[in-house]
Amino acid sequence: MVEVSEKPNTQDDGVSKQENRNPASSSSSTSDKEKVAKKGNSDATKSSTPEDLDAQLAHLPEHEREILKQQLFIPDVKATYGTLFRYATRNDMIFLAIVSLASIAAGAALPLFTVLFGSLAGTFRDIALHRITYDEFNSILTRNSLYFVYLGIAQFILLYVSTVGFIYVGEHITQKIRAKYLHAILRQNIGFFDKLGAGEVTTRITADTNLIQDGISEKVGLTLTALSTFFSAFIIGYVRYWKLALICSSTIVAMILVMGGISRFVVKSGRMTLVSYGEGGTVAEEVISSIRNATAFGTQEKLARQYEVHLKEARKWGRRLQMMLGIMFGSMMAIMYSNYGLGFWMGSRFLVGGETDLSAIVNILLAIVIGSFSIGNVAPNTQAFASAISAGAKIFSTIDRVSAIDPGSDEGDTIENVEGTIEFRGIKHIYPSRPEVVVMEDINLVVPKGKTTALVGPSGSGKSTVVGLLERFYNPVSGSVLLDGRDIKTLNLRWLRQQISLVSQEPTLFGTTIFENIRLGLIGSPMENESEEQIKERIVSAAKEANAHDFIMGLPDGYATDVGQRGFLLSGGQKQRIAIARAIVSDPKILLLDEATSALDTKSEGVVQAALDAASRGRTTIVIAHRLSTIKSADNIVVIVGGRIAEQGTHDELVDKKGTYLQLVEAQKINEERGEESEDEAVLEKEKEISRQISVPAKSVNSGKYPDEDVEANLGRIDTKKSLSSVILSQKRSQENETEYSLGTLIRFIAGFNKPERLIMLCGFFFAVLSGAGQPVQSVFFAKGITTLSLPPSLYGKLREDANFWSLMFLMLGLVQLVTQSAQGVIFAICSESLIYRARSKSFRAMLRQDIAFFDLPENSTGALTSFLSTETKHLSGVSGATLGTILMVSTTLIVALTVALAFGWKLALVCISTVPVLLLCGFYRFWILAQFQTRAKKAYESSASYACEATSSIRTVASLTREQGVMEIYEGQLNDQAKKSLRSVAKSSLLYAASQSFSFFCLALGFWYGGGLLGKGEYNAFQFFLCISCVIFGSQSAGIVFSFSPDMGKAKSAAADFKRLFDRVPTIDIESPDGEKLETVEGTIEFRDVHFRYPTRPEQPVLRGLNLTVKPGQYIALVGPSGCGKSTTIALVERFYDTLSGGVYIDGKDISRLNVNSYRSHLALVSQEPTLYQGTIRDNVLLGVDRDELPDEQVFAACKAANIYDFIMSLPDGFGTVVGSKGSMLSGGQKQRIAIARALIRDPKVLLLDEATSALDSESEKVVQAALDAAAKGRTTIAVAHRLSTIQKADIIYVFDQGRIVESGTHHELLQNKGRYYELVHMQSLEKTQ
């Protein structure tokens, strides 16, 4: 029999756990994945191209191939820049047109200044040759200086409108893209998610949408302004003298060739970088979401290395991209300076030939200077546009995908009066992601209306597939599912799902209140629109029916209690009961219970099962169960084996047949020794217990002040709780978050990331300084050139000679700039990508270093931390690499330019320099505002990204509740709030940006007016004047450019502070600390001495109250009791996930809080309820149990044999090399659990901790695995937490917990004879043939 995975939909983790996923050919699938990832195909499906899909599905008949193809195929969208604006509204486009015109008009201001400059040059020559009087000269000078002031005012207004406008439109359009993307994600069929990592969705919705926003916001305005400057400058040049302008225009062709050639590589590299980061994001999401597992096994180092594999790939492509941009910028500068040389050389010839005058040449040359210089401002933005296009292609490929099974579609019929008869007719099913495995073959089954049908069978037999097909998560490849005789494919999908309520094994709650979580069950029902009062009554009634009301009322905020992300503040049993209340609140026609009580303890299960039995009366119910005691009373029990129906009938009929069902029953039977006590008495006792729990007031059940036995249950689950040794945590948290760092501290901190590159970085700084000195040198050449062209006709011979010399100097300067700019680009590419690589790697390691308390904080949800890794590290590059090089370069320009100006004309230079502090102040003030804005804005995007991540990772729950619309409304609300906040902030900061950019005109007005006066009086000659003015123009422009980087610098400062905070956080339980005694050998005595413990999230409610417990070496003890009584907390404290409030936990008489935590944990092994596997092979996952990368095969085989998984692994084509998929999605729950057990056994631990280790297994697997665990426990101290009491009968001592204390202990037989709590629990779980 082919063993296939059991549970496709039990865990809403975004990478759906496919019950079909026998890893039989996972290696082929993975090689396909790798192939396509390397090609850089679209985001989610690793095999979305038609060729790849056809190859994978080639072995299937054509009609089956088509059905699977529809569920997997993703269109390959060829995005262009225009595609990014596809969601712009008419108003957006009108606004865009206005702000574009403003940007273009702002760009024309500088070329207009060249006209004034040329005119003044002619005037200066006239006064020098005494052609005009001093008064006439003064009048012309004053008038032209005022024109400069008017130009400055116009520039200020236009730049302000442009900057605010583009940021607003960019944010508005990106907001729509974010919403459309999430909307598209929520419409996809589940097969799409089987190929998608949850981390990828987070990366797309945060990092990639941010890239789009960056590419369509203020950078568009800056680019349009630069291009406008370029073109208007050349137009002015052509108008003044077309021949010279035409010759200078030849450089445009050279620039286009350089930009065009290099940008192809830039786009490709950008795309490949994003692909690698997406894959890394998936790994990070896997690890962070299962942090307790990683902590218990000490696998942080191995998992960090796995993450780094993807980071290295991203670094490689990122370096290529940055290097190409550096070379492109160097080439542009070389072309620009060569153009000056060409212009002077040809201009001198035309002047000597009498074809033009000095005024026109100066005008044209200056226009070419400014026009060519402005094109340099376009180059840095090309990366942002290229990244935006790459990100857009990925996002739009998902948005454009037409889902094969679309819950958002209005197509399909509805049935007026649903009766609830379900029929599976000739069903054959293959999961799209595992086309090699047939999960169901020839299934014919009728589920009569109003009756309860139970599905049982071994793990992976196809039971949960029935739920998947009825909910239409998948389409079968042949056959049909009928509801009241209608094929469900013809029915409207949303309507269909609204007729069905699903409770799955691992329920998903949403990060809102208990009341709102239950209310979600009313979506689409007639009761949805009732009054608030009626809805409240329904919700309370449903909670009572699900045995949840009492524990809810015991919580401080009752129904208004926030359950935390995915319900993490509640225990498994509590979450399950809320999920049941949610399912029954709408009084559905069809109820699907996919192991609905498996997470409950026996006490809760008895009552909830009674509630479910009552709830299922009169409605069609399909129950999937491993625990057979829950389905004895079903109208029909269907036994499914290997994807086919083996037998069906009632409990009694099947027991009489003595077939597969009886084997399952025998495997689960508890051998009670009850003497002569009759069965009737036993049943009577059970009924009494149930009625007692339902009717006795909550306080008396709990003997005193703590209402309901589950008051602390919300605090009792190891995999969900906040932790730290005392309530001081809340104060410590506020201190952490309030820590402020100075700019110097942050710069030193970021520089630390580039320590290994410090030598080549110094070279980079050297080249940046040389590049920066280029412009002041060019100012000297320019002033010399103009002076040369001012010579009278009598000296035209000298004029030609000097012009040739200075033209050659320009050519030399161009070559030097080519070398220095390119070298700087290459060096900073290496440095900045290394910085991003180390920042991601170290911050991931810093996260993994943290104790469990850190991950329990609401702001540290999986989505938020994954988003932090993808977004914030990118922002750090705002003070590294290319940006830092450019800042150093333009700072050098400013300093050298002003120094040269002072050296040649100190009076004029001092007047001009007096304006520079104002320029700097404008820029730095804007930088400060943006840093503040960034801190606020980031929080909002983090919460919306975290929300989107939560919704997509719970996609099956969202789909079955038809909650898509509600998710979208909340998400859009969060985006709208963010947009309003950011607009106010941008409106302020843009004032300063516009001021800093337009202030140069006021400087020029002052410089011309004052310098002209000096020249008119004969104090300065033309060379001094032109040199000072030229230096000031470029100097002040450089200052403006520094501050155009301040958005990046603002983001970087905010990001650096977050990183510093993370790195500075030293956890109380620190895995990196060498402190504490190291244990060489362990005997295995565990003691709890008067342990008190409570979680800081609910500091007012104790979890453990004076726990005293001793486990002797080699002893097997079991902890049982109601949900939330502190059993799993005990395991958590043994693992030292948390420290106790008072009292202590001791091993061999030593307080574990004084031991070295790594050394101590190396002697423990944990097998928890939800097994966690990571991407990689089966062998990799088993080896995570030890800290070595390689072990002899014999040891690996022995561990797997002991866990009863060896034979299954060897039956796979690739054996131990089989890839398990994201979160082990290629395997069934049972298979994953056995690999997790092998991982625990390979450690050869002295202490074995089993937290409901067999609860995910069916009876058949459980029996064998339990035998393996029993064998493994020999010679080891073993602590087992169990709901299923059959698994712990053989324990040396069984401790019964209640309210954080031990109320009873002894062996199985002793406790049965006592007829106390344990006896009640056993009684309720006993499975006997009904008489």
Curated annotation (Swiss-Prot):
Residues 1-51 are annotated as: Disordered. GO terms for molecular function: ABC-type oligopeptide transporter activity; ATP binding; ATP hydrolysis activity. SMART domains: AAA. ATP binds at residues 457-464, 1121-1128. Gene3D superfamilies: ABC transporter type 1, transmembrane domain, P-loop containing nucleotide triphosphate hydrolases. Signal peptide: none annotated. Pleiotropic ABC efflux transporter that may be involved in the modulation susceptibility to a wide range of unrelated cytotoxic compounds. This is ABC multidrug transporter MDR2. The lineage of its organism: Eukaryota, Fungi, Dikarya, Ascomycota, Pezizomycotina. The gene is MDR2.
